[in-house]
């Protein structure tokens, strides 16, 4: 607010003097030695004189300013009714009569009372300047205000002590001039500093980096609570780095651990597992009954059902409210021994979390359909997968896993190099007879048990001799060379080869297989797709198409996959998955095998043979024999150094000797 003209500003000059007195007694109060009786009495005497001047000042304002204003405005009343000046004077008089033993207690009381008075007196003066001065300008004429000011100054100067301190009226006028410049600076600075302290003290105004660091110390439950405070906190609480490791089973039971999965390496005891199985059984029975009769009790009285319900609600909340925001940052998901996990929930979680590295589904009631959402390269970063005790898992799940692990760049280059060579069919066939099949296809001879002939699709402009192709069934349609499979060929019934030949794909089929394009050229030793070259369709202005160009045409995003790592799986446990066969083991060798696999547990896989094990082990060069487990009844690879079966005398997982 701009200062009023000097001639009619009734408050600025006297208030400047009052503020000067406040500053003086505050300084004396801080410098006084209260243990010294002399200093203490000197302070009280100074305070007594100061507050007498305060009281005189208030009396002058009441008589010459506020009293006149009340006569012209009914809104002004009781302005100085609670200034506590008289009470303060009584306090000072009482202090002068105290003895030395009472001084310290009195000093503390004095400081508190002075601090309270100061906090009221300064705003009171500011109110007079900002509220009553404009009212005076409204209800009085200019000349009337000039006369009032002269009377006010005369009354203040009539006091001997005041007149001496001000050194006459001229000094007062100089003070007024200065006050016009600094009138509101002190109070505004105090108010501004107070606001700054208030705003800076608020945790909501901390930088996002600091808030994120604070949130990193919170558990998932606390993060969810913080997300309900405001929009800013909700966004920070959904930061991916805070949700790298998910343990819904533990969280549902009150354990909010969210660190790396290192402490979960040890198997729980049978009692703990038995309790989890009882929970799952009780929940399933209750769930079935609830579907039939919804009027029955909710089952909250049963602790097992209550825990399973909490787990189910927690999983649903994760899927719907958290994973859509942080799914790409999730590295670990542990659902071991879950009572409420379903195929649908797992499928949704895996779709949201493409960068998963650690997946533990031990002893859950899932089946192959849980992995239906996996397409080519969907989990290229997966390093640890534990399916122990998942009795419904079959070879189909391993096919999906092999597809989702992708294909290493080095393996792709080797296949493409094989496509680009100009060798004749006779040369290839001769090399196959010499046993160099791995050099041609990049795969080991995993299908040596089958007698089907090798089948190649070649460019129609570069066909082999009729003698070499005598056993082939080959037809040409408008210059397009397409090789049809012979009836006696055995291949995956549900695998990547049971589909139309690439040269005859329609637009619909191309769209359907777009995501899995790189595995359409699987490199199976039976399918021989590693030597396929396709001539352009009739009417096309493109020349001969290689595998690489066809992949780019069908799935333009596949170029990015070449730059990523793939098939980095290090830990695979299928313990107790008794429906797994050699076929499931062999599909894991496709696309480059498992070059980083160190831990392989096939305990309780009753339907695999030594041949299937050998094919898989040959594609796992990093396998550690100490962490290689399979049934003792199987004559398999590394029989002398492998660790054997882990499920002996195990009451909750399949084992060929469980009856012993």
Curated annotation (Swiss-Prot):
InterPro entries documented for this protein: F-box-like_dom_sf, F-box_dom, Hemerythrin-like, Hr_FBXL5, Leu-rich_rpt, Leu-rich_rpt_Cys-con_subtyp, LRR_dom_sf
Classification via Gene3D superfamilies: 1.20.1280.50, nmb1532 protein domain like (1.20.120.520), Ribonuclease Inhibitor (3.80.10.10)
Entry keyword Transport: no
Positions that bind Fe(3+) 1: 15, 57, 61, 127
Domain F-box: 200-246
GO molecular function: iron ion binding; iron-sulfur cluster binding
Name of the featured protein: F-box/LRR-repeat protein 5
Organism: Xenopus tropicalis
